[in-house]
Amino acid sequence: AGFAKAQGDIVITMDADLQDSPEEIPGLINMITNQQFDLVSGWKKKRYDSVFAKNLPSKLFNWAARKTSGVKLNDFNCGLKAYKNVVVKNIEVSGEMHRYIPVLAKNAGFGKIGEKVVLHQARKYGETKFGMERFINGFLDLITIWFLSRFGKRPMHLFGALGSIMFLIGFLS
């Protein structure tokens, strides 16, 4: 709903827990206005999170997201991002797909995606919502994005091939 209401030329998103510093916003805006990026994502290169509970799963998730999407970001989960308004007006984000906005943008034809190292701070407010359920749902969402980007406009390439294989197996047995 927020993207639909956005009116400025550049749209900024960030988490409410203040682990990302608002002072980073001008740097993101600069990359969009002066370097012509469609979207710039923050990269929490030095993190202040639990190694086993968050850092390692995040590294695994980011590696899988890079491999399946072709988007070369180090930190898909960073909530601090800047977008040209035209980008957010041309993508559909639902459920927990917010972490895949760069992939959705790429699939919508916005391929100039940048990344900027941002300061990550210890959590000041609230508690993390990250857990095993969110980790699993993140990978299921990744599979959904991969499927939609690969077969969304030609689903018969997958279903037709699977149906043909099943038909042949049934015919031959």
What is the predicted function of each stretch?
Residues 1-5, 22-100, 104, 121-140, ...:
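Acceptor/aglycone-binding surface of glycosyltransferases and processive sugar-polymer synthases
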Residues 123-173:
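Basic/Trp-rich segment in TM-proximal cytosolic loops or flexible interdomain/linker regions
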Residues 11:
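Short aromatic/hydrophobic "clamp" motif used to bind/position activated sugar donors
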Residues 15-19:
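The conserved acidic donor/metal-binding loop of glycosyltransferases
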Residues 113-116:
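Conserved alpha/beta core of the MobA/IspD/sugar-nucleotide pyrophosphorylase nucleotidyltransferase superfamily
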